Amino acid sequence: MKISKINCFFLLIFLFLTNIQFSFAQQKTENIIIITTDGFRWQEAFGGMDSAIANNRKFNQGDSDLIYKKYWANDVTERRKKLLPFLWTTVASTGQIYGNRNFENKVDNANPYWFSYPGYSEIFCGFVDTLVNSNNYKNNPNTNVLEFINKQPKFRDKVAAFGAWDAFDRILNKPRCGFPVVTAFTPCGGKNPTAKEQLINAMLKDSYKPFDMEECLDVFTHYEAMQYLKTRNPKVLYISYGETDEWAHAGHYKDYLEAAHQFDEWVKDIWHFIQSDPQYKNKTSLFITVDHGRGDQNKNEWTSHGSDIADAHEIWFAVMGPDTPAKGEIKTEMQIYQKQFAQTIASLLGLKFTSEHPVADGIPGIKL
């Protein structure tokens, strides 16, 4: 009887330790890159070019022939692949894509405002602060998930953010957050920029500034972030592109499509680098999303968003990485909110995001 009890005791210890080891073995993601493209509609993400907008002389910039030649196909799966080839090949085959409302797969802003600062705050803080109600809002008083991650010993000083729009200095609370935030026309590279960063800074200074000093062209944000990724090896990186929103506000549908297509190409660029580098290969997750939607019921409102635009709360996201089952386009009926992204991002790194404010639960099914 004594031998049996001893054997049971050691068996329980063995099972306990094995379970711990198994749980650690299951966590493969060591790095994450969060990527956003401002105000890019789910309608184009899942349906490709919208012919009703492309045919409208008010929006097609007098070049509907080029738009059709480059982005049109009668079949929707082919059409969306023309616009976003990386999303609909690599991400669709190895990751998950959410937000196609044709299948009642709904992803929405939880905040009631449906524009940028509140949307990004919801993404990173994991809850809705209704006081955050302006793009000119002060430094965000709410702790964001990047800030939380940066305080964890394993990730300390391994977090960085790059954004085309200067408001990210306030959205992420640059004075407080403790990690580099490089936006708009802020020089990259800190006190010791590399030769490539010095060149980027010089080109940025002399560049065309269609959005004044508030926002740079996406090409600069991309190459700043890529140089940081390659030379400083962060474990957590956020990159925010802005031209999809800017060209939409201008009513330039061709430029909007071109910006989205280029965004897709840059995501591919990021992924190919990740898969070629030993630190990142098979150990990195990507989380791709937007801050808000745009109008669609009234096609003239595709340029706009905000609480007075019926469809502007409708968003989408995609995720891929070693811990995410390859489910492709999600066609099951469900409701997801933007405030769930923060905890989902933390969970992919094996963390639970806690803060002085509420944090919504993560999204089930994203992680093995």
How does the language model describe each region?
Residues 26-96:
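Active-site-proximal N-terminal segment of extracellular/periplasmic enzymes that hydrolyze or transfer
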Residues 71-170:
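Long, well-ordered early-domain segments
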Residues 125-138, 178-213:
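Acidic, His- and aromatic-enriched active-site or binding-groove loops in soluble protein domains
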